[in-house]
Amino acid sequence: METLGLPLPLFEKILFRLDPISLVMMKCTRRSFNSHISEDPYFKSKYLSGVRSGLLHISSFGSKNLFCNPFGDSSSSRHHDFLDITTRILGSCSGLLLLFIDGLCVANPLTKRYRFLNYSKSMFLSRVDRWGILNFDLPSEKMNRLGLAVDQITQRFKVVCMNETETSDPDETMYQFEILTGDSCWRLSATTITCSASVLIMDKKPVYFDGSVHWLRKDGSILSFNPETEQARLIPIKFPLELCAVANKFLFSATEKELAFISATEDLINVYALENALIDPKWALVKQIKNGVSENKKIRYWNVAAYDGKYLVLWEMYKDIYNGVVHGYDLRANKWGVLGSVPSWCDCSHSFYNFTPSPFSSTIELNKKVDVRMITTVRDDYNVRMITMVRDDKHISTLKKIMKLTDEISPCAKSRWH
């Protein structure tokens, strides 16, 4: 590989210090640079190990107000934008976002690539009404059935839609899985799993870890599905005893190394890691943190927002103060700091997503030019109608604003590279 006359270790040391946006620009300068950056597994692994996440948050039911807070930067006033179309964030994985902007969309904000996904062939997401109009048919409260997965080797993405089905036994639930590949082809997996009856926790997002999408159920067990191998399993685990003992807040999340569970009271925050998932699963307590941010008597609401193994995030709303506050705990420095704010009109239905910029994800699948007019044929019992879904300037401008806002994370992502 060309290294501009520099020894390879020194050249890589320079690349490791680049923020994600600068690294993407470097890939475009020479073909040999692009090959080394994109294809060398050692380089990708070491570079990503030094990239820090940021935080995206928006109303769980969709909003035109999107907020972004880079970890380690408390200048929150500039990390907010008004979108042109009501948007929901449904997932974040390996630098990609799964969005709902009048339809499903996968985007890599760093590379500015995106793709609107055709859901007309989905068994679980589409429905033709009596007028022959194709509609997206997933109620707001069931949006957590959708999960985003990115293959860590090929960097290709897949979207998984999980469907719950009742069985003849009222004490059992059967789960089905539909998979969307990058070419917008929906396929019903032959895999089903039947297990003890329980429901998903509505306000808990699915979590991607180690090739699989994981859903937390109300009985504490975890449903897992790998879209590559199409293997499904139920992890028979209960909530930690501390969660059952007192009324508190909790979060289901993942780090680079493990699935994680956070439970918090006004005094103490417990961090758990899942151990022995295949044999004897249990939540092992790995850290306790003093809750130093929810002591204010004027707080009307607070909760755990996000966790990635490096930062723990809490947010709180006050009774008499205009804006709420987003707090971050740096687990390496063992200290709290302010990440940003939340407007006073936000209620408890506010969703937070860790977002880590990645110059590697789905460069092929999202490199295609998006056709702004998608025509879908819908057939019913009486006629055939042509339905035109227009991706107009407002859809594109909404995406551009999301991408521009997440650019705020990139300069901070490598600011503490060692």
From Swiss-Prot:
Coiled coil spans: none
Residues in F-box domain copies: 1-46
NCBIfam families named among the record's database cross-references: F_box_assoc_1 (TIGR01640)
PROSITE patterns associated with the record: FBOX (PS50181)
Protein's UniProt name: Putative F-box protein At1g20795
Taxonomic source organism: Arabidopsis thaliana (Mouse-ear cress)
Taxonomic classification: Eukaryota, Viridiplantae, Streptophyta, Embryophyta, Tracheophyta
PANTHER family assigned: BNACNNG10540D PROTEIN, F-BOX PROTEIN CPR30-LIKE
